């Protein structure tokens, strides 16, 4: 049986409060749809931790700039429902709102063609939706993906805050593939006193090691093979650390050479402390190596945690 689908925020809030009145705990798995095994593993974890689970399916315009791939983001809602039906047992509902930004009334549409001083905007502002409030986690959002996608993390933090306020979950689950995002949500929850447990789940990978992503479907067969250079170079870096090679500049150069040698275009390679996301020069304790690279028109991210005590 396919899960119940809730389309508006008031009905979603009413459902959640009804569950709470019955003493049930609620899990939340935020997604943008086109579900793959990584998403489904989060749902399974949530079902193991809570009584009922809400899977949100909403492609968030607030985390895309007007030049990014909002319009081409893959979608298969009926397929998503079929996948969820196979594991829900009646304990999963889908929150699939049409729009979480338009609250009636519109702001003047922003067109950043030079008329607003080069201000960076998202598809929400560019579309003229009546929304002006954004959540920012100032320090953690500045590096990595925040450099090349300057509206991304404020859009993520804002939509997750909206979902927390609407669904009112006890637990929310996020994949560690989006490592910076996971740490940002953790910090936001701590700083704003949300009474929600944030669970990070290990990266789900294809059999050949490619990190699962909804965007993988847009890779050609050749691009997909070349994209394996990301996960393979990360594994090589981890093996090098185990052999005592701890200079971060050398490790980053090795990864860059592997990706570029496979015709990838590197956005960044960073080696940072797992907790603070501050860069390190020598690996002496727990770090994460984060990579973003383009293959064709598809931007992929991946990372690997390295836990050492040297």
UniProtKB/Swiss-Prot annotation:
GO terms for cellular component: cytosol. Pathway: Cofactor biosynthesis; (R)-pantothenate biosynthesis; (R)-pantothenate from (R)-pantoate and beta-alanine: step 1/1. One of its GO terms (biological process) is embryo development ending in seed dormancy. The active site is at residue 39. Its EC number is 6.3.2.1. Changing residue 132 to A: Reduces allosteric properties. Optimum pH is 9.0. Enzyme kinetics do not match Michaelis-Menten kinetics, suggesting allosteric behavior. Inhibited by high pantoate levels. It holds the Pfam family Pantoate_ligase. It is an enzyme of class 6 (ligase). Keywords: Allosteric enzyme, ATP-binding, Cytoplasm, Ligase, Nucleotide-binding, Pantothenate biosynthesis. It is found in: Cytoplasm, Cytosol. Disulfide bonds: none annotated. (R)-pantoate binds at residues 63, 181. Beta-alanine binds at residue 63. Gene3D superfamilies: HUPs, Pantoate-beta-alanine ligase, C-terminal domain. ATP binds at residues 32-39, 175-178, 212-215. Expressed in roots, cotyledons, leaves, stems, cauline leaves, stigma, sepals and petals. It catalyses: (R)-pantoate + beta-alanine + ATP = (R)-pantothenate + AMP + diphosphate + H(+). GO terms for molecular function: ATP binding; pantoate-beta-alanine ligase activity; protein homodimerization activity. Disruption phenotype: Embryonic lethality due to arrest of embryogenesis at the preglobular stage when homozygous. Signal peptide: none annotated. NCBIfam families: panC. Homodimer. This is Pantoate--beta-alanine ligase. The lineage of its organism: Eukaryota, Viridiplantae, Streptophyta, Embryophyta, Tracheophyta.
């Amino acid at each position: 049986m396919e899960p119940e689908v809730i389309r508006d925020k008031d009905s979603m809030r009413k459902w959640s409060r009804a569950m709470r009145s019955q003493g049930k705990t609620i899990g939340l798995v935020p997604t943008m749809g086109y579900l793959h095994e990584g998403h489904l593993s989060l749902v399974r974890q949530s079902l193991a931790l809570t009584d009922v689970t809400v899977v949100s399916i909403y492609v968030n315009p607030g985390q895309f700039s007007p030049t990014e791939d909002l319009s081409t983001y893959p979608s298969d809602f009926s397929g998503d429902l079929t996948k969820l039906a196979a594991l829900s047992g009646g304990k999963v509902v889908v929150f699939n709102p049409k729009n979480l930004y338009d609250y009636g009334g519109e702001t003047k549409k922003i067109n950043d063609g030079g008329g607003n001083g080069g201000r960076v905007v998202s598809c929400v502002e560019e579309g003229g939706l009546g929304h002006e409030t954004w959540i920012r986690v100032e320090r953690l959002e500045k590096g990595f993906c925040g450099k090349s996608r300057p509206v991304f993390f404020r859009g993520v933090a804002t939509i997750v805050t909206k979902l927390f306020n609407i669904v009112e979950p006890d637990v929310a689950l996020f994949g560690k593939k989006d490592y910076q995002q996971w740490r940002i949500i953790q910090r936001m929850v701590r700083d704003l006193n949300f009474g929600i447990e944030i669970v990070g789940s290990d990266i789900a990978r294809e059999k050949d090691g490619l990190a699962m992503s909804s965007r993988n479907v847009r890779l050609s067969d050749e691009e997909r093979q070349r994209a394996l250079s990301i996960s393979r170079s990360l594994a090589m870096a981890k093996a090098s650390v185990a052999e005592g090679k701890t200079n971060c500049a050398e490790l980053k150069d090795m990864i860059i050479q592997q990706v570029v040698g496979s015709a990838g275009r590197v956005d960044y390679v960073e080696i940072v402390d797992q907790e603070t996301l501050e860069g390190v020069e020598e690996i002496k304790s727990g770090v994460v190596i984060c990579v973003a690279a383009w293959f064709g028109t598809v931007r992929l991210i991946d990372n690997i945690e390295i836990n050492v005590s040297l």
